[in-house]
């Protein structure tokens, strides 16, 4: 990835219109990589819009089905796919009610409190409440259960949120592992993310923090706070 400090609109930067690159936080780019070699495999990207991870999956050679329930957000994904010259099957649907699969791999970037984006949105702590986070955690648990349904036996499921709250990350996945015998953790190996091995937890999950990667030029440092767990369907 490349970082730059430039004035003006993103669309006016060199290479954007030609589809040479897309905008994505460094932390947000990690979950898709943890699916491994997905060339020729069927992959469902759930809650996909605006599509940075969909583009990653398509570029890696997967047969991607991108699902999101918001048509306007899917329109952005469609535009991004066209701009970079990649292809994916697009479905506007509620993941909880969507019938499809099973897939070789599933990526679920669940709706969350987005507290991990605090370095870019410093107002986040004043806009989120404990009750709101609890409600989101319930939604995430339902979406994760559905993602498990959509993963074939032997397939891989990556769950992630851009949240710093354990209720939307570590605690939620621990509860799912206790509750559902169909899944087991597939620990992330430090060698899979060379250079940022310190983000791998003792349990084999991934936890990035906004304070990581400091730089003398503040606009060039840091990354979003993300939680990522990799699971395997039995």
Where in the sequence are the language-model features?
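S-adenosylmethionine
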Residues: 1-234
């Amino acid at each position: 990835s490349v970082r730059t400090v430039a004035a003006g609109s993103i669309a006016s930067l060199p290479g954007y219109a030609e589809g040479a690159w897309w905008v994505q936080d460094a932390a947000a780019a990690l979950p898709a990589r943890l699916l491994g070699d997905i060339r020729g495999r069927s992959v469902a990207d759930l809650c996909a819009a605006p599509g940075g991870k969909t583009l990653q999956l398509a570029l890696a050679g997967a047969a991607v089905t991108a699902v999101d329930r918001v048509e306007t957000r899917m329109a952005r994904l469609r535009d991004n796919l066209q701009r970079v010259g990649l292809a994916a099957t697009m479905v506007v649907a509620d993941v909880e009610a969507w019938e499809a699969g099973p897939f070789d791999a599933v990526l679920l970037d669940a709706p969350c409190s987005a507290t991990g984006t605090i370095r870019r949105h410093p107002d986040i702590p004043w806009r989120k409440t404990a009750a709101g986070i609890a409600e989101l955690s319930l939604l995430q648990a339902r979406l994760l259960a559905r993602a498990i349904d959509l993963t074939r036996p032997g397939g891989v499921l990556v769950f992630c949120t851009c949240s710093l709250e354990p209720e939307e990350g570590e605690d939620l996945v621990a509860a799912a592992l206790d509750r559902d015998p169909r899944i087991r953790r597939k620990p992330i190996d430090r060698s899979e993310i060379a250079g940022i091995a310190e983000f791998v937890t003792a349990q084999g999950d991934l936890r990035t923090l906004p304070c990581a990667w400091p730089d003398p030029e503040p606009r060039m440092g840091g990354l979003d706070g993300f939680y990522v767990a990799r699971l395997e369907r039995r």
